[in-house]
């Protein structure tokens, strides 16, 4: 049974990023269908997988992390326009029976991601 999970770490503060809103979209051509919206818990994780079992299908997905709201709330944003606000990560799921973990490591001026385990 496959599943999709994520978590967010604040690399500037060296701790999990709690309270980050995340939207998951299924991408099909020009169509973007919102599948789920969650907020990270105190551990920077979601309380349940983003998708699992039959809900996870092979295809293209996009996670959109609302980093700007988090950076403002955590006192890491100055006045005016942020360098990073919404961070989209588009990725493919070739085999819906596998586990796909897509973490986000953020700071006010950079981010990184990878396929985790």
Functional labels for PLM-detected ranges:
Residues 94-117:
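Compositionally biased low-complexity segments at domain edges in trafficked proteins
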